[in-house]
Amino acid sequence: MTNGIEKKFKEPDQTQMLNRLWELQKSNGYIHDDNIKELANAFNVSEVEVEGVISFYHFFQRNPTGKYTIYLNNSIIADIKGFERIKETLERETGATFGTNDRTGTFGLFLTPCIGLSDHEPSALINFYPFINLNTSKVKDIITKLKNGASAESICDAPADNIRYTPPGNKTVFFKKFAPGSVISKLVQATPLGIIEELKKSELAGRGGAYFPTWKKWNSAMVQPALPKFVVCNADEGEPGTFKDRVLMNREANSLIEGMIICGYTIGAEYGIIYLRGEYWWLKNKLDEAIKEYHSKGLLGEDCGNIKGFSFDIRIQMGAGSYVCGEETALLESLEGKRGEPRTKWFFPVEKGYLQLPTVINNVETFCAAAKIIEMGAEEYLKLGIPGSPGTKLISVSGDCQLPGIYEIEWGMTIEELLGLCKADDPYYIQVSGPSGECISINEKSRRMSMIDLPGQKDIRCGGSFMIFNKHRDILKILVNFSEFFKHESCGICTPCRAGNFIIQRKLDRLNNGFANETDLDEIKSWGTIMKNTSRCGLGKTAANSLIIAMDKFHDYFKTKLDKNYDGLNLKFDMDAATKDYEEYKI
């Protein structure tokens, strides 16, 4: 850690494992055998454990990945925007095929899930710098420049924030001018209990999707006797179709930092960590610069913000490409330099979190909202939204619409209103809260978005992702993409998720090929129920959500995908076709 943190508290050496792996990956293009022994000795762990950590993360490679490592996004939004054309062009121009390097070792081509640029698809990362709105001519130009010796950094794009809508009448919560120290100055006259009461009054709930009351989490950490305590920002925004936190970090880093400082002051923590997803390497410098500015103004470090006796510091920890690390206990394991496998829930992180010490984990939007609420006051905040869901929410809109981007809506806006704002093109199927969320049909356009979660209520929660698909999109193709994503991202530690995602994927393949029957549909639902009830973490519990909901809402569509001639026997196998090559070439 930096400055005061180093002096007062030393983190165990292994917490630096991911940082060291990143250094090796970036300098060498891969992690070779000698590095394994070196790391095992440095961190006093076995070589097998080091190998286990490396193999868990998507961006750590044991084989060379080329001078220019290209990760092309293969999410469903990229797919409908021209992914296949870009994939073919990259292979043709580089001379490599995906999953390998070209013969000269210049280019390495790899696929990766959503990289947080759904409003700029198709997109890719080259040496972890963003390249957006790709087309065939742009790809040719990029590869030519790289072949001529240009660095990826020198020719990369600067993704626009695309803030399309904020509440009229200057009622935006997130995007008002915010000078460093705006909120910290208020802490001089505030007490931790006063902060808790203000957040309770505002009804702020976690914006990662679970909507747990923020004041309850902070209060639980505040009363813990163990020291030191930690504040962790979950900036591992990995849900496909979500990019709101990217925009906040790029545009409102001050709000994020002050939200973390407020939390530290409230719970009695001195140490903050931003866990930034590997796909957002290009944002790290901006966050580093913001942290330096706060240090230079006395707003971080000893006697933070001129508050005697209050010290707080922040460091950034890079993730390395693992969706499951968005789950809070998996994130904690990753912070400790281990495989990002979810913990069994004997304790909440506020009781035993990072290094088994009290830890508050909130996402970027939650910390920013907390800062803004303390700045404007709960009374003003409560004037926005609807009863039971006060305030505003950031929605990442992408897909078949003319204006993809960020929409800051007041809670209570209907699906129809949002579709109108983004100029949706003949919407038919809408995916809310990403693949792990809920799909809705255009017939449900009158539903409101809110935080209300009651049985039978018509409102819909939205964690942040809002993907729009028109009538020309194949629903099954969308769901297969989601299923492949979950199968790939499952950490594999629990059987229901590991086996369930694989089996569901096979069932969808049968459905896609016209071999499925009603029994297959029933078995998909059964496996979805098993996963929901018995998986270890939220990934497995929600992986089949959209598929099962879609099977109910679009039942007639799924009927058209079944084998109409199925009579209880599998008569599709063609022995003559299967042995054709043997008969032709046998000696």
Q: Model segments located where?
A:
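Feature of Fe-S/electron-transfer and energy-metabolism proteins
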Residues: 1-587
